[in-house]
Amino acid sequence: MNIIFQINGGVGKCILATPVCEAIKSQYPNSQLIVMSGYPEVFLNNPFVDRSFAFGQAQYFYQDFIEGKDFKVFAHDPYLQTEYLMQNEHLVQTWTKMFDLPTFSDTSPKLYITERERIFFSQKFYSDKPILLLQTNGGAQGQDLKYSWARDIPSNVVQSVIEEFRDDYNIVHIRREDQISYEGTITVSDNFRSLAVLIEFSNKRLFMDSFGHHAAAALHKPSTVLWVANTPVVFGHDIHDNIVANPFTKKPELKHAYIQKFDITGNLIEFPYNFESEIFDVDKVIDSIKNQG
């Protein structure tokens, strides 16, 4: 039987889908698992995935995998499930229950990087100092707001971290050209597999809720991860030091909220603090980074 597993979302969601792939294969061991997503490179060398396609690049897919075949499609989005909206269980558990699959207590994602990839890509990241790796901003290209208070790391935190570590570390910043830059950092923008090797190669890491911390968990690299609107209960990993934002200092205006409390892109009127500097305790973040490994 052909099982088509469709993942709608970014690279972080694709990484989170890897334990779901394992659950599918556990339930249907003799099936062929075909993954359709925006980031097929996440699933390369994954022993539980037989084929991985990108949206819009699956010529003759119907004829090859559907027409006249025994097949099953898993395409529902867990973000619309009640359990996800209640935010009281991990997304992987919601996803597997939604498809009536085995639910594992370990929700850790998996990435499979080859030795040749490590050797080739690590040469690009030679550093004369240990590397402190940052991912401070997320979301898709073309966002109106370069900084989302609901998702991204506040500038006062980033600048304090840079000042604290710049003498002893090369501070490498994963960012696209359209994202916020910081003086005193080295910008890196590369393909996913290359960035995964960089994450594995780095000495310390500070992330927000985006693909970086999922990849770090998959590669067994403990990191400091900051959370504002989203919660580590749903998206986090126990390997990390998950620092949740301070209690709100003002009542948010939720005029536009529908089935989720906050717009992850950082709706300006929903901001639940008086000042950006109130979101995190900078000293707590710095201590967490120092205590890594």
Predicted regions and their residues:
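Catalytic machinery of carbohydrate-active enzymes
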Residues: 1-293
